[in-house]
Each structure stands twice: as C-alpha cells, then as structure tokens.
Amino acid sequence: MGDIFHIPVLLEDVINLVETIYLDDGFVFVDCTLGEGGHSKAVLSKYQNINVIGIERDDVVLNRAKESLVEFSKRISYSNTWFDDFFCKYSLHRRFNFILADLGISMFHYKVGGRGFSFLEDEKLDMRLFPSDGGISAYDIVNTFDKEMLENLIYELGGEYYSRRIVKAILEYRKINKIQTSRELQRIICKAYPNVKFKINPATKTFQALRIYVNDELDRLKRSLPLWIANLSKNGILAIITFHSLEDKIVKEFFKGLTKDQYCILTKKPITSSFKEKQYNNASRSAKLRAVKKLYE
C-alpha cells in the first residue's frame, strides 16, 4: 500500500501562481484537498517561510500525507474535515494568501481504497469518501433508485448519452440479484453499450455520476466558492483544479459573477496540462485550472 502515490496535477502552474504574490513573512497557503500532500510538499520545499494548512476529510489519506510531510511538521497544520465545513466553522476571522482546491480523487482511492471507485478492481460498491459519515452509497443507489431517478442521475451528472440503456440493464439485473461490486456494475454497463469501440471505458461516465452524487461534490463546491473568496487576504489568490465540465462550469460562472473592480480573473481560459505532463501523469488529461485574485481587504 505504501508505494501508491498520487502525482499532483498542474503543479508547476500552481507554483507559478504562488510566485506572483509570495511574501517572505506570514504567507499562509491553504490546501483544501490535501490528499497525499503533493502540492503542499512542493510549496513547502520551495518557500522556506511559507505556512500551510492542509484540509483532508479522509483520515487514512491524511495519515499518509503526514508521513510524507513529516519534515515540514513545524510549518504545516492539519484539519480532518470537509473543506466547506472548515471555512464555515474555523476561519471566520482569518485571511489567507493562497487557497488551492484540487477537486480530483486521490490515486489512493482508485488503487487501494477498497471503496469501489474504480471498475478496474472488484471492490464493494460504496464510493463514499468517508463511510463513517453515513449517507447514501453507490450500492444503495443502483439497487434502490427507480428508473427515472437513475436515468436523471447518470445523464445529468455523467453526461451519459446511453443512460436509458444502462438503467434498463441495471433494472433487469437487480430483479434477480443485488449489484454488489464495482466490477459487477461495470459488466452490466458494458453489455448495455452498443458494440462499437469508444475512447473511454463505457462505465466511466456512470461511475463519475455515482461518485459525484454520493459525495455531494457539486453542491459542496457551490457552498465553498463564496467562503473561499471571503477568506482571501488582499491580493490573495484562489486556484481551483477541476476534472469534468460540470465542476468547471460552476467555477467559471462564479468567477464571471465577481465584481470586476474587486477581483481579477487570472485565467481568461483555463490552464490545462502540457503534452509532457500528460505523458507521465495520465490523470492530468482532463484537469483545468482557473484562478482569481482578490484586490481588496
């Protein structure tokens, strides 16, 4: 398990943004999605006087990050909570120089998390980032939601053109058996798809839709955006890395709605990964980085 590490995406671009506003004293960088600490480690290594707050809800992943960042223990503090809860409860009277939110799922969850995020492994169908929080699981959804609910979920959150065919196959299957595992669901989806070649696995969009719904990803992002902006210091930067069009649209529209004399959008078009990065970090293919600077106190 120890050798599975998440490679941070668009790392050089994040560092370049930090460089534009870095102050040698009292600079605070908030990593809203610490994961295994890749972005934070790079920032702490490059800037000797920077302090980091790392937010990570998954305590297993957080412990892995702490191991990776042990040499920086005097300059980093941790919060084991969701990022929207952190800003609601703990930072009402603080201002931060840089806030980063990388909305991708850690490689740990895909490779060894055991929660059914990946159809490449035969795991229990769960997809909750933190199961002890309770809430609905992917297993609950595929085995209890009715036809209309499933079709809407898969189409709207996954952009899946064949949502009706997939749902029909799911409903037929569960007449006989419960859908227990990620590989089981993947097989059902693949059989429902037309017999032609596609660039991505037929199950990709459905799995995305389930993960988004289970973890309340879009509403959590919507709740967080005004909190992040409110907690920036003057000349502070908010940088957000998204991985699908639904997230990117939310961020884009929020930035567009900000008052122009109080905020400066730093990315007229989103920053995407270079050809070189795509070669060594496949996860970066769909990553988009948008950033905005706050111009007032």
Curated annotation (Swiss-Prot):
Query: Which enzyme type, at the first EC level?
Result: transferase
> Which molecular function terms from Gene Ontology are attached?
rRNA (cytosine-N4-)-methyltransferase activity
Enumerate the Pfam families for this protein. Methyltransf_5
The GO biological-process annotations, alphabetized, read as: rRNA base methylation
Reaction catalysed by this enzyme = cytidine(1402) in 16S rRNA + S-adenosyl-L-methionine = N(4)-methylcytidine(1402) in 16S rRNA + S-adenosyl-L-homocysteine + H(+)
Q: What is its EC number?
A: 2.1.1.199
What Gene Ontology cellular-component terms does the record carry?
cytoplasm
InterPro entries to which the protein is assigned, alphabetical:
RsmH, SAM-dep_MeTrfase_MraW_recog, SAM-dependent_MTases_sf
Which top-level group of life is the source organism from? Answer: Bacteria
Keyword Manganese annotated: no
Q: Which Gene3D superfamilies match?
A: Putative methyltransferase TM0872, insert domain, Vaccinia Virus protein VP39
Which subcellular locations apply to this protein? Cytoplasm
For binding S-adenosyl-L-methionine, which residues are annotated in this chain's numbering?
Answer: 37-39, 56, 87, 102, 109
Q: Which UniProt keywords apply?
A: Cytoplasm, Methyltransferase, rRNA processing, S-adenosyl-L-methionine, Transferase
The family note in this entry says: Belongs to the methyltransferase superfamily. RsmH family.
Q: What does this protein do?
A: Specifically methylates the N4 position of cytidine in position 1402 (C1402) of 16S rRNA.
* Stored HAMAP family: 16SrRNA_methyltr_H
Record protein name field: Ribosomal RNA small subunit methyltransferase H
